[in-house]
Amino acid sequence: MVLALPDDAFLPFGPDGLSSGDTAWVLTSAALVLFMTPGLAFFYGGLSRQKSVLNMMMMSFGSLGLVSVIYVLWGYSMSFSNGHTGANDIGGIIADPFALFGLSQLLETKELADGATGFVLGGFGTVPAIVWVAFQLTFAVITVALISGAVAERMKFGTWMLFGGIWVTLVYFPLSHMVWGGGLLSASEGGIAAKLFGVDEEGAANVAPIDFAGGTVVHINAGMAALVLAVLLGKRAGFGKTAFRPHNIPFVMLGAAILWFGWFGFNVGSEGAADMIAGQVWINTTAATAAAMLSWLVVERIRDGHATSVGAASGVVAGLVAITPACGALTPIGSLILGAVAGVLSALAIGLKYKFGYDDSLDVVGVHLVAGLWGTVGIGLLAYSTEEPAGLFYGGDYKQLVVQIVIALVAVIFTGIMTVIIAFIVKPLGWRVTREDEDTGIDETEHAETAYELA
């Protein structure tokens, strides 16, 4: 069916050239990304044991409530306010948390730093500022929720909420600013990339770091925090001796399906416009995800003799993670390669927790940290461009690869150090349930509920 639209349906509107089409797409993308957090709750809930499924899902829903409030109050300001006010940030790490506190300033019609009333960061001049806030808020929410998979079945809910509030403030917002807000890991004149390889006539880095939708900010960040917590919190009783099997595999499959669906908002929405690049990102996201799912299943078949539904779901997530930073920089063939390698790497990496003795309960490290690192660094090999520096496999030199390795390492080091500090602040308050509570089930002891009442 062909839908007839008026000639001016997608023309810019407003004094600043804001686009109704772009605005509608970013709002839709924000809703899609928000839907990913309930999807993650199903994914993690299904992977958990029956006695802890509600707690696992509550950690995701708790993050949704807590981080949303914090982001409105000071989160956006800490990440992006310098782009609106023109003020300097603090050491390339953080913007002023009070400059846009509560966001009411973004509803005013007075001119901003560059004379516009719309969004003024990163070239998204066709989308109002408050719409971009909505989109960015959903990223912060799911990043915190992702970490919870590493502490499943043994961390107190209240302590988890306290940790999440501190962590998103001291780790997520600074890293978001560093990468996307003109900080140390951006293409700005004061960034690390500019110091390594110089700047062009406009003051931007000659070799710009590439993180299209959150390989560093979301996945390396969450994965590294998960590793720290898994090590410091300790193992579940019976780890390495008892098989902790998923209690509801249909939940896992449902969660993976919701995540895949929502990820189109995550990646395609990061373009900030309904244009050709958005189509490229959609295709690349699909290609990488499908390739990762298949390669994970091949690894399972060779290693274990079976291709499992949990493996398929995990492969989907690994592919989505890997393509996140690279989705706007690769060809479809490059995306297939990136995804296929991600599926293999993550399928092998999830076994490292048994070798090194850390209890990453739901494989946040093996999937998000490993695939996030590969996706970020793989850009230096597979990036395709006729104008900007390309990856090594497409005629480029070493520079893009070096920049990608540097931003990945900085993210790992920054998140690791800060998460250790936060963990030692929270730990004395009592962050782990007792052995008795763990045996009984954290659903009953923390929430006074059970998931299933079967006669």
Residue ranges and their predicted role:
Residues V2-A455:
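Glycine- and aromatic-enriched membrane alpha-helices
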